[in-house]
Amino acid sequence: MSRISAEAEKVRHALIEKGIETPMIALTKSKNERRIGIENRMREVMQLIGLDLTDDSLEETPVRLAKMFIDEIFSGLDYTNFPKITNIENRMKVSEMVLVNDVTLTSTCEHHFVTIDGLVSVAYYPKKWVIGLSKINRVVQFFAQRPQVQERLTEQILLAFQTILETEDVAVYMKATHFCVKCRGIKDTNSYTVTSAFGGVFLEDRETRKEFLSLINK
């Protein structure tokens, strides 16, 4: 098993301490062992719903699903996949808001294992550190690649950046469509869900929060 980076461990510990870590157990098997286990069980599931796995269109589906679960859509359950973050000292004394708007987010509803599709905006006021802008996208993607509920995902992203940047002054805004609502149950194709999380000056100062919300809605 690969080792978890110090940055990833700090973030994981912060989430556990606050009680907002995704419910999960320790990974004791290798990726290949987990892929094989999922493949075998997905084969059973597909047969139980009546699919013919001798058909050439379906016979490799259990293999594809196992790879997708481990290497792609649920890769954020494994902290060895946490993005490498290099904190850059804020020598330029940047003091204005840094905002990355409309980060594409694709996650999976943990209740029905169908898609959550949306956009995320992340802002912070630098203190000691800044980070590369693409790292914001990568951290968002890491936490999205898990079975999720949107409210917890929003809080996880907030706390992750507060931990990495060593500042409370972070804001997160998320707008997403839930396919568990769109393609099953009520089958509402029009609604979306908005969540937000604020820390530091974004929480305490109404004008700062207002500025953030006006910028992301331009």
From Swiss-Prot:
HAMAP family: FolE. It holds the Pfam family GTP_cyclohydroI. InterPro entries: GTP-CH-I_C/QueF, GTP-CH-I_N, GTP_CycHdrlase_I, GTP_CycHdrlase_I_CS, GTP_CycHdrlase_I_dom. It comes from Mannheimia succiniciproducens (strain KCTC 0769BP / MBEL55E). Belongs to the GTP cyclohydrolase I family. One of its GO terms (cellular component) is cytoplasm. The keyword rRNA processing does not apply. GO terms for biological process: one-carbon metabolic process; tetrahydrobiopterin biosynthetic process; tetrahydrofolate biosynthetic process. It is an enzyme of class 3 (hydrolase). Its EC number is 3.5.4.16. It catalyses: GTP + H2O = 7,8-dihydroneopterin 3'-triphosphate + formate + H(+). This is GTP cyclohydrolase 1. Toroid-shaped homodecamer, composed of two pentamers of five dimers. One of its GO terms (molecular function) is zinc ion binding. SUPFAM superfamilies: Tetrahydrobiopterin biosynthesis enzymes-like. Pathway: Cofactor biosynthesis; 7,8-dihydroneopterin triphosphate biosynthesis; 7,8-dihydroneopterin triphosphate from GTP: step 1/1. Keywords: GTP-binding, Hydrolase, Metal-binding, Nucleotide-binding, One-carbon metabolism, Zinc. Disulfide bonds: none annotated. Zn(2+) binds at C109, H112, C180.
